[in-house]
Design a protein with these regions (language model features):
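Short beta-strand element of the alpha/beta-hydrolase
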Residues: 89-96
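Alpha/beta-hydrolase fold nucleophile elbow
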Residues: 156-167
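Conserved alpha/beta-hydrolase
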Residues: 112-131
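Alpha/beta-hydrolase active-site loop
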Residues: 136-156
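An N-terminal hydrophobic leader/cap segment in hydrolases
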Residues: 14, 18-69
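Short glycine-enriched nucleophile-adjacent loop
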Residues: 170-181
């Protein structure tokens, strides 16, 4: 009988060690998968980097001005400037959402032009035609917005700048306009977060 209980104890210990080992293996495999996961597929979002055909058609057809500038760290930033047919000292910067590009903001262009604004559509860092491989969640995007506001002030020193963002763009607009020094440059920020 002692032999039976000793064998059962050893078997239970062996099974316990096997379960712990399997748990470590499964946990490590899950961790490795998370590090290399195609997040746009997992999250169900498609990266709209490649399809800028709507923007390019409007630039050619309607005379929208393609713009390229450099951020403070040298990253190439691309955008499209749309001057209002009426003379205006007000410009709104439209900021797209995560995994998108500036064409996401086209539906807002006519609304702002009807209200008398010039419009600047930008591709945020790591999106569309702008450089960078990913978003930095506001660490560098505020510097990028500094570069865009400087570009606008270079066109018109008295420009009044507003921002309208969608999702990630709304967060960037609010982060940017929430710092005291930058409030001097932005007249308003609109949040369009779902």
């Amino acid at each position: 009988m002692r032999f039976f209980f000793k064998t059962v104890k050893i078997l239970i210990l062996f099974l316990l060690l096997a379960f712990v080992g399997a748990g470590f293996y499964a946990g490590n495999a899950a961790y490795e998968t998370m590090l290399t996961a195609p997040w746009e597929k997992i999250l169900g979002v498609t990266k709209q980097t490649a399809d800028l055909s709507r923007i390019h058609r409007r630039e050619q057809k309607d005379g929208w001005q393609p713009v390229e500038i450099r951020s403070a760290d040298g990253t190439k930033l691309r955008g499209t400037y749309i001057e209002n047919s009426r003379s205006s000292d007000r410009t709104v910067i439209l900021l797209h959402g995560l995994y998108q590009n500036r064409s996401m903001c086209i539906p807002y262009v006519d609304m702002y032009r009807d209200m008398g604004y010039n419009v600047l559509l930008i591709d945020q860092r790591g999106h569309g035609e702008s450089g960078g491989s990913h978003t930095t969640w506001g660490l560098r995007e505020t510097d990028d917005l500094d570069a865009w506001t400087e570009w606008l002030r270079g066109k018109d020193g008295g420009v009044k700048i507003g921002m309208h963002g969608i999702s990630l763009g709304a967060a960037m607009a609010l982060i940017y306009s929430g710092t005291e020094s930058r409030l001097l440059y932005t007249s308003h920020a609109a949040d369009d977060t779902p």
